[in-house]
Amino acid sequence: MKDIKVSVLIANYNNEKYLIECINSIKKQTYQNVEIIIHDDSSSDNSIKRINKYKNIIIIKNRKRGKYGSYNQMNAYYRAYKKSKGEIIFLLDSDDLFKKNKIKTVINAFLKNKKLSSLFDLPIYKYKNSLKLVKNKKKIISNFWPYIPPQSCIVMKRELFQKMINRINFNFFPDIWMDFRIGIYLKYIKKDFYILNQNLTYYRQSQEMISSNFKFSSSAWWKRRKQAHHYVKYFFFKNNIQHVKNLDYLLTNFMNYFIR
């Protein structure tokens, strides 16, 4: 196999409970030419002490955490990217894990298809002692809202990350996280939305996530959906793409009228 250098960018904030398991999932990869860069977002727990036990890990310490988690996450990955040297960029949240063959499998996919500039693998949802595999959802990418796997399933070539980051980093959509922004960019600008039909990432779901205020059809869910539509509308405007007010858009605005 061609010895392609890989950068795994890890965004961490107060995740000492899972951080060691996360790092070890990279250290134990069957593919070896990997650098690990961890951006710690002013953690108040023992995250830094745990990271310092490892050799050959680049640590970026952010002194001041911002108000919105979505902006903090984008900042973390961008700062980590600027320190990286890999040809292929893997994103990983610090409570998630890679299967030990993930990097090797993904690199093989890039080598087999030279036109690929990005891909998503499929997650395994991990909640307490239960695991749930997500099935292939390739067909859904034809919809207005593409199916977007979690953050830690995203992989892309270095040059694409650089081109993309400044075109998705609008700091006035606080409920719109980086995975959604990346998905919209790849679908409508790059037109390169490839899902690798293998479950290679353990995506951890906490009780807080299960009990989230963003439950389907809750008022918070409709408000965030409206913000997602506004993000897409602004994104289309910035990139000279015609925005069509489809049924979903009209329904979302209708529901938000009654829950204000």
Q: Model regions: which residues?
A:
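A conserved acidic beta->alpha catalytic loop
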Residues: 40-49, 64, 93
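Short, acidic, metal-binding catalytic loop of nucleotide-sugar glycosyltransferases
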Residues: 24-33
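Hydrophobic/aromatic residue at the end of a short beta strand that borders the catalytic acidic motif
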Residues: 92, 98-102, 156, 178
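Conserved nucleotide-sugar donor-binding catalytic segment
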Residues: 139-217
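Flexible acidic/His/Gly-enriched loops in nucleotide-sugar-dependent glycosyltransferase catalytic domains
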Residues: 62-79, 103-163, 214-215, 232-233, ...
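Short aromatic/hydrophobic "clamp" motif used to bind/position activated sugar donors
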Residues: 89
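Acidic donor-binding/catalytic loop of UDP-sugar-dependent glycosyltransferases
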Residues: 46, 96-109
